Amino acid sequence: MKVRASVKKLCRNCKIIRREGIVRVICSAEPRHKQRQG
């Protein structure tokens, strides 16, 4: 899980979602693409 000021999609499988006020990126194809804004 990367914590970044600005989260971006890194591949076409990445999805940007918002959970409890935190913007996250989840990726089914590449778990290393997981990010959250912070």
UniProtKB/Swiss-Prot annotation:
Q: Name one GO molecular function term.
A: structural constituent of ribosome
Top-level taxon of the source organism: Bacteria
Q: Does the keyword Cell cycle apply?
A: no
Q: Which GO terms describe its cellular component?
A: cytoplasm; ribonucleoprotein complex; ribosome
Stretches that traverse the bilayer: none
Q: Is Secreted among the key words of this record?
A: no
Please give one Pfam family short name: Ribosomal_L36
What are the UniProt keywords, alphabetically? Answer: Ribonucleoprotein, Ribosomal protein
Question: Signal peptide span per the entry?
Answer: none
A single GO BP annotation from the record? translation
Q: Which family does it belong to?
A: Belongs to the bacterial ribosomal protein bL36 family.
Q: Which HAMAP family match?
A: Ribosomal_bL36 (MF_00251)
- NCBIfam families named among the record's database cross-references: rpmJ_bact
Q: What is this protein called?
A: Large ribosomal subunit protein bL36
Query: Origin organism of this chain?
Result: Pseudomonas entomophila (strain L48)
Name the gene that codes for it.
rpmJ
